[in-house]
């Protein structure tokens, strides 16, 4: 036993290899293997007559993604992912800044609990709870009626992009649910990035005559930007792949996740479902490459 211990001590590379081999094998089999299986299925043929997969190679599935109806699904999903990411930044950055530079230890603890609280409940429970909040007769409509703002809401809901008779059937309602659920994934990376910004830099900017907006633009934002990008990795990718919220909240119109579920679970067109699944993979890969160049991984 001592001889074996001495061997591992003297040969650190061998020790490291033995430690890393099991997780790397698991990663290779489960993750890389599943991706290769996905790619292999995306080039197979689906026979509409027999409703079965035929082992004939084709690129028709990827060409089918460019059909206007399918392209609309991709653009709809991408637009919501971008909107949710921007929304979480606008809400999360002030919260993260206060937590990092102004909150007392007790206040910071309360903020952390408040930010993390949505993650303690089941995802399905949160989504269903929002359908109740957004429905006619829900708390939000009750508050708007009390303030006399219901007419203003109805005017907003008539806008083409917002669309919907009520909040529960509008893109605005869907956006609110996405933003609420993914907000913790944006706040925490930004807060970690801002905490690394020395307070002396902000004070020095003010001493040199910099106005608050100038200090934010030229000092705080560039230094906190990697944290913003790190948080956006989560919000962007999670929105791209989600299919529960689009089913529960918002107007009719499929997202990528819904289309994959329909193609595979209802129709049985696995090759087309695999081709649709490749879309968020490609988008997220491009986004991760951009995030890495911006130094976002240092803020994770």
Predicted regions and their residues:
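Cytoplasmic-entry segments and transmembrane alpha-helices of multi-pass inner-membrane transporters
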Residues: 16-20, 95-133, 202-203, 225-226
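Transmembrane alpha-helices
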Residues: 22-31, 86, 117, 180, ...
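Short membrane-interfacial helix/loop motifs at transmembrane-helix boundaries
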Residues: 31-70, 137, 250-251, 263, ...
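N-terminal signal-anchor/first transmembrane alpha helix
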Residues: 1-40, 108-114
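Transmembrane alpha-helix signature in integral membrane proteins
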Residues: 68-101
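Membrane-interfacial helix termini and adjacent extracytoplasmic/periplasmic loops
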Residues: 5, 9, 127-179, 213, ...
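C-terminal transmembrane helix and the adjacent membrane-cytosol boundary/short C-terminal tail
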Residues: 2, 7, 191-202, 206, ...
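Interhelical loop and adjacent transmembrane-helix boundary motif
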Residues: 10-15, 49, 62-69, 246-292
């Amino acid at each position: 036993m001592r001889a074996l211990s001495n061997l591992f001590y003297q040969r650190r590379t061998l020790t490291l290899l033995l430690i890393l081999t099991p997780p790397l094998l698991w990663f290779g089999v489960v993750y890389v293997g599943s991706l290769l299986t996905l790619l292999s299925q995306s080039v197979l043929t689906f026979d509409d007559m027999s409703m079965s997969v035929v082992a004939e190679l084709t690129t028709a599935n990827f060409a089918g993604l460019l059909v206007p109806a399918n392209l609309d699904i991709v653009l709809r999903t991408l637009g919501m992912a971008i909107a949710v990411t921007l929304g979480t930044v606008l809400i999360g950055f002030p919260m993260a800044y206060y937590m990092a530079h102004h909150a007392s230890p007790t206040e910071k603890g309360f903020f952390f609990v408040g930010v993390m609280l949505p993650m303690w409940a089941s995802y399905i429970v949160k989504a269903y709870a929002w359908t109740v909040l957004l429905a006619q007769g829900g708390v939000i409509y009750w508050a708007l009626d009390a303030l006399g703002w219901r007419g203003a809401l109805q005017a907003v809901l008539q806008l083409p992009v917002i669309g919907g008779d009520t909040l529960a059937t509008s893109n605005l309602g869907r956006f609110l649910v996405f933003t609420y659920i993914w907000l913790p994934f944006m706040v925490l990376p930004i807060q970690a990035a801002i905490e690394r910004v020395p307070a002396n830099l902000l004070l020095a900017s003010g001493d040199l005559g910099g106005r608050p907006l100038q200090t934010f633009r030229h000092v705080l934002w560039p230094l906190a930007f990697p944290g913003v990008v790190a948080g956006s990795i989560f919000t962007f990718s999670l929105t791209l792949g989600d299919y529960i919220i689009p089913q529960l909240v918002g107007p009719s119109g499929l997202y990528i996740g819904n289309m994959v579920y329909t193609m595979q679970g209802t129709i049985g067109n696995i090759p087309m479902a695999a081709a649709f699944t490749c879309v968020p993979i490609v988008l997220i890969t491009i986004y991760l490459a951009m995030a890495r160049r911006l130094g976002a991984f240092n803020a994770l």
